[in-house]
């Protein structure tokens, strides 16, 4: 019997809605990355984008464990000499785009390459509880019930 290899035309993508309120960032990101890659499916094929579309709401209400809220630093470079920039997780979460903490965590758990970039386009993260994807009829995934460690009361 030959190894099963799914073709891109055979892929069935579902829409999944996750409420991130009170969830631990790393645990949430690992579940999202698994769903984006399609590793939760029996038809997983490493070189095919067979993951689901994931919508994350309330990304501004995520929780970091330990002292990471104050101490975790995100670095980036502008491209100019001496252009290294840094922000703490607190500055990002309390700033204009709090959803970037979740996006970065997931981005670093997905493979770096053309397939990983395509899979990241299937992730939509929103700071509030509103999202424009009601027409897709997303299925709600309760991450808090998967494991008691996924939730941390602030």
From Swiss-Prot:
This is Large ribosomal subunit protein uL13. Part of the 50S ribosomal subunit. The lineage of its organism: Bacteria, Pseudomonadati, Pseudomonadota, Alphaproteobacteria, Hyphomicrobiales. One of its GO terms (biological process) is translation. InterPro entries: Ribosomal_uL13, Ribosomal_uL13_bac-type, Ribosomal_uL13_sf. Belongs to the universal ribosomal protein uL13 family. GO terms for cellular component: cytosolic large ribosomal subunit. This protein is one of the early assembly proteins of the 50S ribosomal subunit, although it is not seen to bind rRNA by itself. It is important during the early stages of 50S assembly. Keywords: Ribonucleoprotein, Ribosomal protein. The gene is rplM. GO terms for molecular function: mRNA binding; structural constituent of ribosome. It comes from Rhizobium rhizogenes (strain K84 / ATCC BAA-868) (Agrobacterium radiobacter).
């Amino acid at each position: 019997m030959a190894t099963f290899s799914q073709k891109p035309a055979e892929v069935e993508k579902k829409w999944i809605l996750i409420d991130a309120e009170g969830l631990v960032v790393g645990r949430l990101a690992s579940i999202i990355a698994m769903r984006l890659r399609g590793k939760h499916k029996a038809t997983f094929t490493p070189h095919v984008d067979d993951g689901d579309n994931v919508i994350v709401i309330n990304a501004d209400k995520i929780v970091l464990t330990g002292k990471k809220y104050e101490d975790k630093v995100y670095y980036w470079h502008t491209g100019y000499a001496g252009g290294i920039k840094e922000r703490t997780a607190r500055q990002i979460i309390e700033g204009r785009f709090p959803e970037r903490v979740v996006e970065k965590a997931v981005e670093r758990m997905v493979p770096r390459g053309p397939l990983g970039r395509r899979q990241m386009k299937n992730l939509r993260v929103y700071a509030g509880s509103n999202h424009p994807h009601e027409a897709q009829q997303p299925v709600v995934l309760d991450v808090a019930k998967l494991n008691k460690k996924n939730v941390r009361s602030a």
